[in-house]
Amino acid sequence: MRPVLKAGLRAVWRDRDTLQIGVDPRRAVALSGMGDAGRVISLLDGSRDWAEVVAAAKDAGISVKTVQRVLGLLAGAGALSDLPLATLNALTPVTRGRIGTELATASLTYGDSDGGARTLARRRLAFVRVHGAGRIGAGVAGLLAAAGVGQVVCRDGGLAGPQDLSPAGLGLADLDLPRADGVVRVISRIAPDVQTADRGERPDLAVLTEPGQPEQAAELTRAGIAHLAVAGAEGVAVVGPLVRPGRSACLRCLDLARSERDPAWPLILAQLAGAGDGARDGSCDTVLAATVAAQAAVQVLAFLDTGRPGRAVSDGA
């Protein structure tokens, strides 16, 4: 093991003898009686294994017993990572820099001691298909690619219009060109190593960003493919549910439940399904679309990382 303080955790002194690891109250740990032993922290940069850390500390005048105590406290507090060198060496310098923050966040979120290596491996093997390349769909695809998902494919048969342009997705250069091709360009600018070709394989998850497409959801349910519904209209956006066929309610179930409360819902739903391309991202402004895309990406990544739907996040979560 080559111990390193988990990326993102900051070491600060509360007083001369108490070292605090992390600032967020949910993760912060205070280690008392540290004194000069705090110098051991500077040796935990991932370049040394346990024995080399002990040797370097000894050269600095720190006893073996003290080093072992510090390492034991940090390990017990879940503040150490051991990211395999092979994982880093397999990445290009640019990818390593881009993925580094993803690994740090994953390691903190899931409590892994491998520096996020397991999470990275799962994401790189994952395949997500995004249906719809409007402001929301293009944003979701770009975020997933940037977060390390190995294959992101976008299905959309339309051409890009001014209403599709967004800092989080398609740009001026994509106007009047196929939206799906525009998403490929978005991904290639961020993560050129991500696969974008649609060869018809079965995805690990599908994201539905176009409203009023019940037959699409039904097809995914029949195929047993997990899918996340995302909608934005009339200034309101909804992320979810994330449907796991055979394990959770499907979108059809929700429509039936709504029909019990509102007998006119089937008629309304049929009209929404026939609204055509003009209903895409209707009244979902740029900021809302970007927010929805980010929240959808959070849900997708949680599912890929753990096999379970994520939870809504907020500043106080």
PLM-predicted stretches and their roles:
Residues 1-317:
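Adenine nucleotide-associated cytosolic modules
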